[in-house]
Amino acid sequence: MQDFVSISLVYLGIYALSVWSLNLQFGYAGIINFGWIVFQSIGAYFAAVTSIGPVTSHSYQTYIFGSRLAFPLPLIVGTASGAVLAAILGYVVLSRKIRSDFVAVIMLVVAIIALQVVTANVSLFNGANGLSGIPQPFNGILHLSQSGYQWFYVGWLTVICVIVYLGVEWLCKSSWGRSLRAMREDEVLATHLGINVQVLRLVVFIIGGAIAAFSGALLVEFLGAWSPDAWSFVETFVVFVAVYIGGRGNNRGAFLGALLVPVIFGVFPSFLPAFGYPGLSSTLQWVVIALLWLCTFYFRPAGIMPEGRLIVQREGQPDVSSMFRRGWAARRAQRSEAR
């Protein structure tokens, strides 16, 4: 039971980072990134190959860039790889005046091609067999039991999630975040307001890709293995549904979506005993997630926690909202006296 709870909490932390990265791109900037899973996967792969060590004649795995870097360098390399890939793809795709629906299709094609290339080419990351034997950070120093190490990872991941959440919230509530909202609502108007839309889209795409790669690096360091089966392009759909159900443009809502969709309907059923024919439980997971998304789409399109209204006041200007509230209270008082 303890392993069940600790593993579920680890996945909750990973999915929290995942939804925050996608919420930056999709919720705040309006970029439909159907290739999001590629960034998480490249972070996992590069964190893995920089932790395992170089390939030798006795190795049972083949991969590129094999080295054994000291922790936390593998996490840094994995995060940087996601940022570099996002910069390349963002420059190619987002710098052109391509409609958002075409961008979504292009990124989906990129995810499918990347999966096929990594699976078919054994020399990259050991092909369809994937990578295994990835050392877990701190495990050789702390000498904890398996259960103890899992709970240690839960605590460490909680600290990371709090830091990332505070950083993302600070970005989204700053003037930079307001520019993202303006770009999402009307790019033409944002351009006339002096916002460089192309640069802004590229920057938020890089930040989101880096956070996604960081989540993949953290996950592979915990699992100790990674294979192409772990990053099918349909995994992007789960994160999208979590952001949409929780509330796009709201980081707390995105976290709630991560708790509901990937963890409750994704992680929990994997620990339940098998019933029916083989594969029935996994099939029902997708059915429930799809039905949950449809219900949200029809009955609460803004999500469980919708994006709040943003009232901005410049320094030296009167507080219009407080003036309105005082005027409204005065009118109510006059009406009550008249009665």
Report residues per predicted region.
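Transmembrane alpha-helices and adjacent helix-loop boundaries
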Residues: 1-339
